[in-house]
Amino acid sequence: MLRRVALGLLMAAVAGPAFGQAYPNKPIQLIVPFAAGGPTDVMARIVGERMGKELGQQFIIDNVTGAAGSIAMGKLARSTPDGYTIGIGHLGTNVVNGAIYKNLTFDLINDLVPIALLPSNPLLVVTSNQVPAKDMKELVAYLKANADKVSGGTAGMGSGSHIGVLAFFDGTGTNYQLVPYRGTGPAVQDLIANQIQIMIDQSSNSLPHVRAGKIRAYAVTAKQRNAAAPDIPTTAEAGFPGIEVAIWHGLWAPKGTPRDIIDRLNAAAVAALKDPEIRKKLEDLGQDIPTPQQMQPDAFAAYQKAEFAKWKPIIDKAGVKIE
């Protein structure tokens, strides 16, 4: 009898943290790989706040900038896999960086566990108001004639804006000097001030400034016009088919995070994107919202691997590598 009691106490002590406390019982840190005010940060705050309500715990934003998101993803990969540190990233941070950075100390596929696919964001071709071009064809002609005078901003090598630039260069035959920033928020401010002249930027970041008349939009890099900006033509409509890029986002946890916690976080993310108020906020920013089936961890993991297979040859062809 005493032996059974002792064994029961031992099992309770071992299982106590897992079964004695419901997850989550404290705030959750959400690592954001870019500066405050950029599109990834905005999405993290919108979705994270609603997920926090669903889970009954606050999401604390941790902006970790540098190396186009690789520093943030490295921090996430090294975090304790207990569900209290997760990260938001996108096509650039969690796919393209794996093809660009030769000396990453972690594996984007094997060291991070997908939680949920989040909305995707088409890109806008935008310039400062001082660029004298009325449409895409005039813009391309201007860029070719002034390649040595024009500079464009990105959120760093491998960022969504950098991916857009590579597709833009390939589809238009243009080239110009690239200026890396620690996020597109600061870059678009320099675009407004004409410190840089062009960006291929996520619509959620640029569209408010286009609407305010602070910058000019020429095309959206999608198959169809964006419902949030139906007056902006697609790149194909503007005369440049083949420039189609959407920056999808997602949530990840460190490898080793228990599956029941992954599923709990996924359910909270799905609930957040079903909320009509949240959907409207994201759609007003030009975001395309995935279905609950697309958001599931296993479906998202398969999609991430397929995207890596798609983009690695493109990156290799462009010769973009960072030691």
Region roles according to the model:
Residues M1-L7:
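N-terminal export leaders
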Residues V14-G20:
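Sec/Tat signal peptide C-region and signal peptidase I cleavage site
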Residues G20-N110, K149, M157, G173-Q202, ...:
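N-terminal (or domain-start) structured segment
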Residues R78-Y84, L91, A99-P186, T235, ...:
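Hinge/capping helix and adjacent helix->loop/strand transition within the periplasmic-binding protein
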Residues T93-N103, H162, A167-G171, I198-I232:
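A ligand-binding cleft/hinge motif common to bilobed small-molecule-binding domains
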Residues K134, S206-K280, I289, A306-A309:
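C-terminal lobe and pocket-closing loops
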Residues M295-I322:
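Extracellular/periplasmic bilobal clamshell ligand-binding domains
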